[in-house]
């Protein structure tokens, strides 16, 4: 289900949310409450650090999180138990589910200085290179932004040693386009409202 109208803001500018009327918010919150009521999804606080720490210490059987946490989890667990990964679950039975990418944005601001502009562009090219992206993925779990990174030795070696990294990549490629996420210019304000009201 879409988060906002107009094809999740991809066919035209989003003008209204849909999650409050299409059942997706209610389904998600109902499922989440059922897990909490059953005692299998405790409230470990705001943010993800406490949940990740509990999982890494063997205090919980599973955790939901960003792929960006995977390397840290594997490091923290340090072989004390097997860390498995799976596709992100769907809420509604029969729903294929999917994932979207986000975070780790790279921005370059116009300063009017041509030398800085040229240096910034060289730095951006370095960061988005297949070699840098393969290393970044292996060290963090973040998705490489280019599939050319998959051809790099560091990427292949990491997948061979930690096949858990492949799960998120596979699910991203298996996700339908509507899971790419909503384009909504007021997302920062909307998040703040959800968090505070």
Feature-to-residue mapping (PLM):
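Pocket-flanking alpha-helical
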Residues: 52-54, 70-76
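Short helix-initiation/N-cap motifs at beta->coil->alpha
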Residues: 43-57
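Extracytoplasmic/periplasmic substrate-recognition and gating elements
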Residues: 34-41, 75-143
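Periplasmic solute-binding protein
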Residues: 1-13, 29, 100-110, 190-197
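Glycine-centered hinge/linker elements that transmit conformational signals in sensory
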Residues: 6-45
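Paired acidic/hydrophobic, glycine-rich loop segments that form the ligand-binding mouth/hinge
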Residues: 61-66, 84
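C-terminal capping/gating helix-and-loop segments adjacent to ligand/active sites or protein-protein/ligand interfaces
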Residues: 163-197
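Stable alpha-helical elements in mature extracytoplasmic
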Residues: 25-32, 51, 69, 116-120, ...
């Amino acid at each position: 289900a879409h988060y906002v109208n107009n094809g999740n803001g991809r066919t035209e500018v989003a003008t209204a949310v849909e999650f409050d009327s299409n059942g997706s918010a209610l389904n998600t919150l109902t499922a989440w409450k059922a897990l909490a009521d059953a005692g299998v999804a405790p409230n470990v606080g705001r943010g993800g650090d406490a949940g990740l720490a509990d999982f890494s210490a063997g205090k919980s059987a599973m955790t939901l999180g960003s792929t960006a946490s995977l390397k840290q989890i594997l490091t923290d667990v340090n072989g004390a138990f097997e860390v498995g990964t799976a596709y992100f679950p769907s809420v509604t039975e029969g729903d294929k589910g999917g994932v979207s990418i986000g975070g780790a944005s790279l921005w370059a601001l116009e300063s009017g200085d041509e030398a800085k502009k040229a240096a910034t562009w060289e730095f951006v090219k370095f960061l988005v290179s297949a070699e840098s992206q393969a290393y970044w993925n292996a060290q963090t779990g973040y998705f490489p932004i280019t599939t050319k990174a998959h051809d790099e030795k560091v990427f292949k070696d990491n997948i061979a040693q930690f096949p858990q990294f492949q799960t998120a990549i596979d699910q991203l490629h298996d996700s339908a386009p509507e899971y790419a996420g909503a384009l909504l210019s007021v997302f920062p304000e909307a998040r703040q409202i959800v968090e505070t009201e």
